[in-house]
Amino acid sequence: MGAHSLPSASAADAVAKLAAAEALKSTAASAASASSAPGSSTETALGTAQGASAAGGAGPVTAVPSSDTPSVAVDPEAEAEAYERANVHNVYEAIAPHFSATRYKPWPAVAQFLHAQQPGYVGLDVGCGNGKYLGVNKNVFMVGSDRSANLVAHANERVKELQKPQQQQPEAEVVRARIGGSKKEKKQKQEVPTGGERESEAPNAVIGKETGSEVAVANDVLVADGLSLPFREGRADFAICIAVIHHMSTRTRRQEAIRQLLKCVRPGGQVMVYVWALEQGESRRGWDEGGEQDLLVPWVLKSQQPKPKKEKQPKASKQKQKWPQQQQNHDSTEPQEAITAKNVGEKEATPTSSSILSPSSVPKDASMTIGGGTGAGVTEPASAAAAAVAGPDAKTDTGDAAASADAVFQRYYHLYRNGELEEDVLAARGAVVMSGYERDNWWVVATHATNDDTLQD
Amino acid sequence: MKVMTLNFLTCAVKNCKSSNDSFPLHPKEAELAKDDIEINPQLLINVLPRIDWAALRTTSTELGFPTLPEQPPSPEDLQSDEALLKELHELLMETQMMEGKLVCGHCGHEYAVKNGVANFLLPSHLV
């Protein structure tokens, strides 16, 4: 060790001194308090969406009133931002628990990219959602970021789970609860994830450690906007951005997002971007070459409860949908989408539902709490618009539940046509290393263009 | 928020990126905790050259730890010295900033850290 004496036992002492006492009591206590200070995972899974403003880091997101910016939005950039806030950010905040419960299986191409990274590499996952890509490669350190504080709260749960010292007990309980398939769990399968972009027909529903994993993994997560990232430029070895950029509503912003990713990685570092494809001939969504590329895609939070709680009264349908051209294809696309979604939703949701995050004590009316409790100012604009646009579709796939109880959220998507992603990489002063198509998605691995002289700045 | 992560973060404000004052961010009113994480020697040894050591020294000092040596340990040091490896692990991976603020030394903007998660969303006038 010689001259290199790091803060040793004294460091631990200092930590202990400064730390909240309860956080140090035990591993379990530490993990619990670190991931969701106020309480159990149950509370987190349901409470984040419900009480966003009360849930720590969630405040800033929901605190931005969606009605403010549109009224003052005079420049296109601000307008695009406001649009995305209403039709992407707020939606994810609202559907975070359900969304998270359906997202656990990595896309193969992404997993392959991650596994190709060297031990000790430092990577970024921009738009990490619930953090399903954290821990795929256990020998890299990854920092995930997402615009949605509620999703980041889920990702943080995952981080804590992944880094726990080996304890079979908790995991075994989860598995048992899952296999048991209690009634309670069945009642959880209310979500109908209509967007298939982060698909997951996963046989393995364990969100925490992957099956067979025995290495503890260190990762981290934070809340950030993809266009204003807090990462020091040129420091990361690699970055991924999966099913994120298609949520940006202008081409300029999509290209800028790729530019930001490239700036984060060192020279030679690689960035993988994955977006929903326009060409989905194999899927039942009905989208294909030549179709409309800018769409609002519904996410239906279904309730199968006989007596759902009332949804909060919409404050107003103040957020009139702009850009009407983006909805022109709804009639033709949504029915198929809804059907697809239902099938996918049932398949996906059944094994996992919220059981992973809250194995036993989910309130019966969880879905409605989530659907309606996110804060009217936040979700109603999207929801109201959704009702107007997708109401009939929602009914078609409800059948076994009260249609009126379903909460429909619209998410904006830009469907990439063949070649467009590569064009955007070039426009972002990047170079395409490789690219491909995987189950309704285009992907690209990009790096800095060799003549990019802005790397130094 | 791990100390490790802090070593890769700067201010989210565009104008601050080019300023040396924006890195590292300065912890303020930090409440720390220590996670119990299994050590991954291979990862640590390979991560070491990716660490900005000077920034780590600053962060470490600001968090109240004893001053780090001026020079980082070498991979060989780490490989041969288990105690050193463990110390590095404790500092980088296990030490968590649970609550507090991260302050940009350039623009002065403060980012909140709550429940161990830092929030870098900017108010509209800073975007």
Curated annotation (Swiss-Prot), chain B:
It comes from the Eukaryota. Residues 2-123 form the TRM112 domain. One of its GO terms (molecular function) is tRNA (guanine(10)-N2)-methyltransferase activity. GO terms for biological process: maturation of LSU-rRNA; maturation of SSU-rRNA; positive regulation of rRNA processing; rRNA (guanine-N7)-methylation; tRNA methylation; tRNA wobble uridine modification. Keywords: Cytoplasm, Nucleus. Pfam families: Trm112p. Gene3D superfamilies: 2.20.25.10. One of its GO terms (cellular component) is cytoplasm. It is found in: Cytoplasm; Nucleus. Coiled coil: none annotated. Transmembrane segments: none annotated. The keyword Cytoplasm applies. Heterodimer of mtq2-rmt-1/trm112, forming the eRF1 methyltransferase. Rmt-1/trm112 is necessary for the solubility and activity of the catalytic subunit mtq2. Interacts with trm11; required for full tRNA methyltransferase activity. Interacts with bud23; required for full rRNA methyltransferase activity. Belongs to the TRM112 family. Acts as an activator of both rRNA/tRNA and protein methyltransferases. Together with methyltransferase mtq2, required for the methylation of eRF1 on 'Gln-182'. Together with methyltransferase trm11, required for the formation of 2-methylguanosine at position 10 (m2G10) in tRNA. Together with methyltransferase bud23, required for the formation of a 7-methylguanine in 18S rRNA. Involved in biogenesis of both 40S and 60S ribosomal subunits. PANTHER family: MULTIFUNCTIONAL METHYLTRANSFERASE SUBUNIT TRM112-LIKE PROTEIN, UPF0315 PROTEIN-RELATED. This is Multifunctional methyltransferase subunit trm112. It comes from Neurospora crassa (strain ATCC 24698 / 74-OR23-1A / CBS 708.71 / DSM 1257 / FGSC 987). The lineage of its organism: Eukaryota, Fungi, Dikarya, Ascomycota, Pezizomycotina. The gene is rmt-1.
